[in-house]
């Protein structure tokens, strides 16, 4: 490989050319509070992808994919693992609970998922979620409830405590587990002791845990790679279709979400670069997944929430129950302020609008188009939760189509009023809608362009 300079001498006023080489990465992100149906969009794109990656979060995410009538549930594994021709990557930004990962793989194996371990690559820089992180997650929730009378509503999967360990530089990574086990054991014991000092009721079976971790190390060793080099090679090698599957969603982002009722990672587009070690230059299409109405799990402000028959109807018709927690989701009308905000941050190429069929029975459908604060319209999405609680939503009313859309497979098949609803969203947010979902199966995603 020659290392000749590829740009002219700066002294002569020459400019370095923009390096536009390499494969582009397609990204799928949630544009609301999660549960938008990202798994289905990923599944659609994964059939043609060579590499499918997760870049952040852990097994707090829940994606359901239906293939040939069989439902697969994914939490840590990229849902593209179903594609037997593709490689799945768990990036450095993901936090990994090893027993959770193996249990999930085995459960899906029983449903027919074959040879997953030959298709999975785990970044050696990913941090490990230990059982005590999960225990601490539960203890912190109890503490919050006692102090403030409210909790964050975490999934108790140890995600927050693991990212805390990572930020305070006491965390342990996959590369540590696979290296000198004696050194790993010492650091593991120190970390456990730190948590026990903070939470005196915390019980940690150190020796039992280490014994299991040693076994996990051997199970995963063949799957572990240097993630940065792997992605660099994939991007700069022969043409490949690379897909990144975001977990959680814009309003759960640690920086841009409805803080503190958020997750502990960046679930917006920036998390793709930091969670896989890829340059922004190689980000291609960014698809936002939007449900045709809004849902939220746990507490926190929710301007368009409907605590009435509408909310109940959306909840029952949409089967709005969390994949990871089994909790009922709160439901409300579609909120375009949220979508515009998510688009400001992510710069979506297009939207996938899912679960349109849930609105089939409505006489009238409302869409939140703007917020007012003290009688004045505000052009932004408030950062402060107390302020967000106080906003007044301005709605536009659209007539319902009152007919079953679940059998529609082409845009022309949709009732005109349903088409109007889709166009209304596009025009108000300024992002084209590429897919419209009218059911659970792969076939029920109508592609528009």
Swiss-Prot record:
Annotated active site: 35 (proton acceptor), 63 (proton donor)
Transmembrane segments: none
Annotated GO CC locations: cytoplasm
Cofactor(s) this protein requires: Mg(2+)
SUPFAM superfamilies in alphabetical order: P-loop containing nucleoside triphosphate hydrolases
InterPro entries reported for this sequence: Adenylosuccin_syn_GTP-bd (IPR018220), Adenylosuccin_syn_Lys_AS (IPR033128), Adenylosuccinate_synth_dom1 (IPR042109), Adenylosuccinate_synth_dom2 (IPR042110), Adenylosuccinate_synth_dom3 (IPR042111), Adenylosuccinate_synthetase (IPR001114), AdSS_1_vert (IPR027509), P-loop_NTPase (IPR027417)
Location in or out of the cell: Cytoplasm
Top enzyme class: ligase
Biased composition (Polar residues): 1-10
Residues the entry annotates as binding substrate: 35, 323-329
Keyword annotations from UniProtKB, A to Z: Cytoplasm, GTP-binding, Ligase, Magnesium, Metal-binding, Nucleotide-binding, Purine biosynthesis
Catalysis: reaction(s): IMP + L-aspartate + GTP = N(6)-(1,2-dicarboxyethyl)-AMP + GDP + phosphate + 2 H(+)
GO molecular-function term, one example from the UniProt record: magnesium ion binding
Residues the entry annotates as binding IMP: 35-38, 60-63, 155, 169, 248, 263, 327
One of the protein's GO biological processes: 'de novo' AMP biosynthetic process
Cytoplasm listed as a keyword: yes
E.C. numbers: 6.3.4.4
PANTHER family tied to this protein: ADENYLOSUCCINATE SYNTHETASE (PTHR11846), ADENYLOSUCCINATE SYNTHETASE ISOZYME 1 (PTHR11846:SF2)
Family according to the record: Belongs to the adenylosuccinate synthetase family.
Summary of the function given for this chain in its UniProt record: Component of the purine nucleotide cycle (PNC), which interconverts IMP and AMP to regulate the nucleotide levels in various tissues, and which contributes to glycolysis and ammoniagenesis. Catalyzes the first committed step in the biosynthesis of AMP from IMP.
Subunit structure as annotated in this protein's UniProt entry: Homodimer.
Protein's recorded name: Adenylosuccinate synthetase isozyme 1 A
